[in-house]
Amino acid sequence: MKNKYSTLLILTLAVFANNAKAQETVYPAGPQKGVSAITHATVHVGNGTILTDATILFEKGKITAVGTGVSIPKGATEIDATGKQVYPGLILPSSSLGLREISSGVRGSNDYQEIGENNADIRSIVSYNTDSKIINVLRSNGILLAHVSPSGELIEGRSSVVQLDAWNYEDAEYKANTGMYISMPSLMARRGGRGGFMRGMMMGGGGDPLKAAFDKIETIKTYFIEAKAYCQEKVHANNNLKLEAARALFEGKQKLYVRANEVKQMLLAIDLGKTFGFNIVIVGGGESFQIAGLLADNKIPVILDETHALPASEDDDVDQPYKTPAQLQKAGVLFALNDVSDNSKQRNLSFNAGTAATYGLTKEEALSSITLNTAKILGIDNVTGSIEAGKDANIIISMGDILDMRGNQLTQIFIQGRTVSLDNKQLQLYERYKHKYGIK
């Protein structure tokens, strides 16, 4: 019997050892050493400008020079980009990346949502898991930064921007507490399509959904009224973390991200911003094309949840989600493109931009919608979003057009000047099973 258990133990350890070998061993890169120079590159700056046969110098994680007449210092590490396309690192504008791993009911891998209507004091950054297998997959497709946000019923909590090459959440932190997320209740009597967006609202079959929605809207307003009064007081008998969380909103240091797809939801968001003096960002924007002029007049940016989607309403054109980015661009709305179907599917962010470029945007406008526009909305455009001197060296090099599935073949990526691995779990499995079946 003893020998039987010993044999079983050995077999078990062998299985674990084999599985361990199958796991990726992708480590965060060390700091940049010396000066690096990308030469003979076609540089897509991110602001609409294209430079041909250009050179990019970066040192200590910062871009020091970009142009066609740049002198390369002696001893610099040269990266020949002849025939290649160079872009700013892509930015995922709203995601549960690192908070949610396996969506199909594996609770231990998910930490993106708290119970209750008011979780204003929640900070998503502390739950960010740098060991997520999804991070490397997104990074291999050019996404170098992500805006990580919580989810919830109503007042969801605070978001942060992370860079996708780190050992822990402290290292990953790019900009902490960028804003607060709320989910605007739906004012549709019946749900339908993406326009019936109503995250987390559980209504009984016999209840009045509109009354329930207005009650929840009053809950949001009451919270901000109480938070404003709290923040105006200099001394408090007791600290209230939920009310304190809104202080930066009233001071204009953070933005209020409002999940809203319906026109009525967005109108309520605009009104909320005017009432309390908040900087509002619409997240979703399925029907934003219907009020594009109003959004532009009120300087309300939009994070479009998905381009590869069905229309929000049965009366919309079948290709309306493809056309919405161009319509917002024409109206003068600052917008960014997103992909929210699934964390691993977000690797297709650049292809959403490619579709938008087919339906009215220019290629460089589409690129801006996943780089510089996103950086502006998140308040990080002073350090990233474009390839310009003084900004972080967040750079991707591709064999071809990154907006096209056929051309998006990355050869190198840099995050704050560090040469970052392109390997990921999916690539390793691809190589593993090629080897098994003798495929070259």
Task: Give short role names for the model-derived ranges.
Residues 8-17:
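Bacterial N-terminal signal peptides
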Residues 40, 102-103, 109-115, 119-121, ...:
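His/Asp/Glu-enriched, well-ordered alpha-helical/loop segment
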Residues 2-5, 20-72, 84:
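N-terminal metal-binding scaffold of metallo-dependent hydrolase/deaminase domains
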Residues 53, 149, 230-321, 336, ...:
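Active-site core of metal-dependent hydrolases
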Residues 24-30, 43-55, 67-68, 362-370, ...:
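Acidic, glycine-enriched loop/beta-strand segments at the rims
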Residues 41, 56, 61, 83, ...:
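Divalent metal-coordination and catalytic microenvironments
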Residues 134, 141-280:
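Polyanionic/metal-chelating signatures
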